[in-house]
Amino acid sequence: MKNYLSKIYVIHYTKLIERKKHMISEFDKWNVDIPWEIFEPYDQEDISQLDIIEHFDMMAFRGRHSREMKTGEISLCTKYKKILQKIIAEDEGDYFLILEDDVIFKEDPLKYINNLIAKCEAENINFDCIFMGEAALRVGDNRDVFAKKPYPSTNGLCTVLYTRSAIERLFASLENYRITQPMDWEFNDRFRDLEFEVYWGKAI
């Protein structure tokens, strides 16, 4: 089986030590033999005021949500953006999987993803990102689905496959316009504005 996936990143909060152990166990269980990285910088305790000014429009956030942005939300957004930046600057390849650190795979993730990308290539299906997480609306969903998802297109950000082109465009957008929402809804609007081809795959 051809391997299409270039690297896996895991967003991790370092104080949750058991979650890091869990993710390493998941990779061992499924014999994940491609590069992966547990991304730890920018914990909520380490975010500086300069980080906030650079990445966030807090006045707009308060106007949208009538509250202050939580430190955990700030950290998650910053980690995600820094991963996108790192991929662009340091990694080769065309496809990247970004995970949150509490993912439990129900099947071999590499096999499923490689087969799905092969299907897309064979059938000339162009996608920017594919959601494969069992979160929120998809708890207990075991259907083998693959369909284009209109706005609002996100369902949590726990298991998302991106193309390099999508990562480059998304990062450029985040550089040009500061974050004004929690990450899930921020990405919903960015994907719409960037005219992303968003699909939902099987919740693996």
Residue ranges of each PLM-predicted region?
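An acidic/histidine-cluster motif and surrounding catalytic segment
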Residues: 1-99, 103-204
